[in-house]
Amino acid sequence: MEGLTLSDAEQKYYSDLFSYCDIESTKKVVVNGRVLELFRAAQLPNDVVLQIMELCGATRLGYFGRSQFYIALKLVAVAQSGFPLRVESINTVKDLPLPRFVASKNEQESRHAASYSSDSENQGSYSGVIPPPPGRGQVKKGSVSHDTVQPRTSADAQEPASPVVSPQQSPPTSPHTWRKHSRHPSGGNSERPLAGPGPFWSPFGEAQSGSSAGDAVWSGHSPPPPQENWVSFADTPPTSTLLTMHPASVQDQTTVRTVASATTAIEIRRQSSSYDDPWKITDEQRQYYVNQFKTIQPDLNGFIPGSAAKEFFTKSKLPILELSHIWELSDFDKDGALTLDEFCAAFHLVVARKNGYDLPEKLPESLMPKLIDLEDSADVGDQPGEVGYSGSPAEAPPSKSPSMPSLNQTWPELNQSSEQWETFSERSSSSQTLTQFDSNIAPADPDTAIVHPVPIRMTPSKIHMQEMELKRTGSDHTNPTSPLLVKPSDLLEENKINSSVKFASGNTVADGYSSSDSFTSDPEQIGSNVTRQRSHSGTSPDNTAPPPPPPRPQPSHSRSSSLDMNRTFTVTTGQQQAGVVAHPPAVPPRPQPSQAPGPAVHRPVDADGLITHTSTSPQQIPEQPNFADFSQFEVFAASNVNDEQDDEAEKHPEVLPAEKASDPASSLRVAKTDSKTEEKTAASAPANVSKGTTPLAPPPKPVRRRLKSEDELRPEVDEHTQKTGVLAAVLASQPSIPRSVGKDKKAIQASIRRNKETNTVLARLNSELQQQLKDVLEERISLEVQLEQLRPFSHL
């Protein structure tokens, strides 16, 4: 302070500003308090503001003392005058004007302040103007503004008509007038002396009581009235009682008032009681907002994406935190885009904030999309309001309010802050926004929930089992319906946990093979599929007999019989039950497999062990065609198929030789035999189901689906040796078949259990991690807020 020389006007002006910013009267102004608003009103780039804070020493101290504050104000004036920003410039620059602070809501006042700044030293009254903005509510300040404004308003009173009539065009042509207008609302009575403006600028107190008159005048000039009344809320209250102050002081006061948005908002609320809802959008404003919307989105029924809205609203030069709060309020449906109603609400909030109103915590009812009447606004398309943005602040729709002009002025500068918009969502005024993002980002839990249904979806109901399997036979991989697949691959098991259980239960309910019930609708198709699988070595889709077996004597003979059986199966698919009973005595393995699809197979199982075994083998065969069609699963079920084939080889020596014959024919035949063995195991499972071992039947079927041709070949060789065995051996092996099936089912159930447990653990872990992520993000937000408080200009 020692080296700082101030004129009387500067001394008074700076002292008033310091008193205004020193809310707690501690002689130490917090960096992130009103000083932040004051420097924002200076309309300097962020880097310049930071440099000023650095030069004055506030950054180092963490607060503004009186000396730091005065130096900062001097540096602001230096920067605004275009001189190099150095401490030496404070005293070297002669006739340095007073710093100009343009509150967004009162750009007009800011212009007045600028004009005063040119006469700063002559305007010792400046100090009087600046009595701390908190005094906005005070009568003194308001009264001063009225008298001082009157001389200017006289000129303005004439001008206002044009801006009112054509707010868009007139503001650009007479921006000063517009500024004055907005000032007049603040200084309400300044124009009373003038007959024309009188009604417009009646003192605020009168404006409240006689606002209707003012409105009527404005109605003559539709666009301005909303602005006047709207903007005047903050400024007019003091003006109503005060008419004695000098115009210069009044202007200064108005600028300061605009800076003190908090106190102004409080008074606005008090004094707006007699007014209409301050958040209500007038027709003129609606028209302007709609026109602005059309410039971005021609379709009024369309929406503006978040990126376009960001670019548009950053031109308002509002802080990122405030823009983020406005976005939260206006994006009513949280879809990341703005409809016409939402855009109008957002625009209205921006205008209100530029005019010094505090943003509401919740979206006012009058701005709710459902309550916003935009019907007429759609027709308003001529207003060049957006041009006003890029052009002059005055262009900002007069209909909106003086605040709009301020938006226009700062529009190009606001583009600078567009880069910071990215922080918009991150820096949302409250951590709740981020929490919402987390909840949206954290649909991991929903995903897991979806994952569980996936297996259910993959396992169709019994009604659709047949069609699903028939289709899947064409595309082998998608065979989740069969629980056997669960065994071959754990992944399938997880997806099929529910399906396998349902499938088994369904089979048991359906007489040992509920799938047969589901298949009963198309037993012929099933039989054909079975024959296909048996003849799969020949890869013939039809029920035609399989290709001739290799030169192996026994296999060929058994193969021929099996082929005959297949033919009979195709013929008797509809009569599988009766055929099953007749065939078991002749050749238990082949005839029964073709007949197995029918529930009769289970009946033979119950009736006799032989019949059951033969029926199981036929059942296995028919089921295998369904499963055998899933050639892609052979790789997975190879091991299971081999085990089952071994068991069945012991159980059904005759059936095994028949399969051997098919195996030598080709690797495909081997796959057929594997499918047959799988079918056998499946058949044994249904047999068990009928006996009361229903759960066993379903799992073996899918597991025994063709997996690896090589593995299958090996078991087939064993089967050939076993096939040489007698039917007695087969009968003896029959009990072992259900046992093996039981073992298989137990293994499958165990794997399902393990997979379920693993899935549960992972789901819990996922939810815990999501919660941790939320906590971390919230902590990050709080830290960022603290950091911004310590470095308030980092986000300007």
Curated annotation (Swiss-Prot):
<dbReference type="InterPro" id="IPR002048">
    <property type="entry name" value="EF_hand_dom"/>
</dbReference>
<feature type="compositionally biased region" description="Basic and acidic residues">
    <location>
        <begin position="671"/>
        <end position="681"/>
    </location>
</feature>
<feature type="modified residue" description="Phosphoserine">
    <location>
        <position position="709"/>
    </location>
</feature>
<feature type="modified residue" description="Phosphothreonine">
    <location>
        <position position="173"/>
    </location>
</feature>
<dbReference type="InterPro" id="IPR011992">
    <property type="entry name" value="EF-hand-dom_pair"/>
</dbReference>
<keyword id="KW-0677">Repeat</keyword>
<dbReference type="GO" id="GO:0043231">
    <property type="term" value="C:intracellular membrane-bounded organelle"/>
</dbReference>
<feature type="modified residue" description="Phosphoserine">
    <location>
        <position position="162"/>
    </location>
</feature>
<feature type="region of interest" description="Disordered">
    <location>
        <begin position="105"/>
        <end position="237"/>
    </location>
</feature>
<keyword id="KW-0479">Metal-binding</keyword>
<feature type="compositionally biased region" description="Polar residues">
    <location>
        <begin position="612"/>
        <end position="623"/>
    </location>
</feature>
<dbReference type="GO" id="GO:0005509">
    <property type="term" value="F:calcium ion binding"/>
</dbReference>
<feature type="compositionally biased region" description="Polar residues">
    <location>
        <begin position="115"/>
        <end position="126"/>
    </location>
</feature>
<feature type="modified residue" description="Phosphoserine">
    <location>
        <position position="740"/>
    </location>
</feature>
<feature type="region of interest" description="Disordered">
    <location>
        <begin position="377"/>
        <end position="433"/>
    </location>
</feature>
<feature type="binding site">
    <location>
        <position position="335"/>
    </location>
    <ligand>
        <name>Ca(2+)</name>
    </ligand>
</feature>
<feature type="binding site">
    <location>
        <position position="342"/>
    </location>
    <ligand>
        <name>Ca(2+)</name>
    </ligand>
</feature>
<dbReference type="GO" id="GO:0005905">
    <property type="term" value="C:clathrin-coated pit"/>
</dbReference>
<dbReference type="GO" id="GO:0017124">
    <property type="term" value="F:SH3 domain binding"/>
</dbReference>
<keyword id="KW-0225">Disease variant</keyword>
<feature type="modified residue" description="Phosphoserine">
    <location>
        <position position="166"/>
    </location>
</feature>
<feature type="modified residue" description="Phosphoserine">
    <location>
        <position position="482"/>
    </location>
</feature>
<feature type="compositionally biased region" description="Polar residues">
    <location>
        <begin position="407"/>
        <end position="433"/>
    </location>
</feature>
<keyword id="KW-0597">Phosphoprotein</keyword>
<dbReference type="GO" id="GO:0006897">
    <property type="term" value="P:endocytosis"/>
</dbReference>
<feature type="compositionally biased region" description="Low complexity">
    <location>
        <begin position="575"/>
        <end position="584"/>
    </location>
</feature>
<feature type="modified residue" description="Phosphoserine">
    <location>
        <position position="540"/>
    </location>
</feature>
<feature type="modified residue" description="Phosphoserine">
    <location>
        <position position="272"/>
    </location>
</feature>
<comment type="subunit">
    <text>Homodimer (Potential). Interacts with RAB11FIP2. Interacts with RALBP1, CRK and GRB2. Binding to RALBP1 does not affect its Ral-binding activity. Forms a complex with the SH3 domains of CRK and GRB2 which may link it to an EGF-responsive tyrosine kinase. Interacts with AMPH, ITSN1 (via SH3 domains) and SGIP1; may be involved in clathrin-mediated endocytosis.</text>
</comment>
<feature type="domain" description="EH 2">
    <location>
        <begin position="285"/>
        <end position="374"/>
    </location>
</feature>
<keyword id="KW-0106">Calcium</keyword>
<feature type="binding site">
    <location>
        <position position="331"/>
    </location>
    <ligand>
        <name>Ca(2+)</name>
    </ligand>
</feature>
<feature type="region of interest" description="Disordered">
    <location>
        <begin position="506"/>
        <end position="624"/>
    </location>
</feature>
<feature type="modified residue" description="Phosphotyrosine">
    <location>
        <position position="288"/>
    </location>
</feature>
<feature type="compositionally biased region" description="Pro residues">
    <location>
        <begin position="544"/>
        <end position="554"/>
    </location>
</feature>
<feature type="compositionally biased region" description="Basic and acidic residues">
    <location>
        <begin position="708"/>
        <end position="722"/>
    </location>
</feature>
<feature type="binding site">
    <location>
        <position position="333"/>
    </location>
    <ligand>
        <name>Ca(2+)</name>
    </ligand>
</feature>
<feature type="modified residue" description="Phosphoserine">
    <location>
        <position position="143"/>
    </location>
</feature>
<feature type="modified residue" description="Phosphoserine">
    <location>
        <position position="145"/>
    </location>
</feature>
<feature type="domain" description="EH 1">
    <location>
        <begin position="10"/>
        <end position="113"/>
    </location>
</feature>
<feature type="modified residue" description="Phosphothreonine">
    <location>
        <position position="544"/>
    </location>
</feature>
<feature type="domain" description="EF-hand">
    <location>
        <begin position="318"/>
        <end position="353"/>
    </location>
</feature>
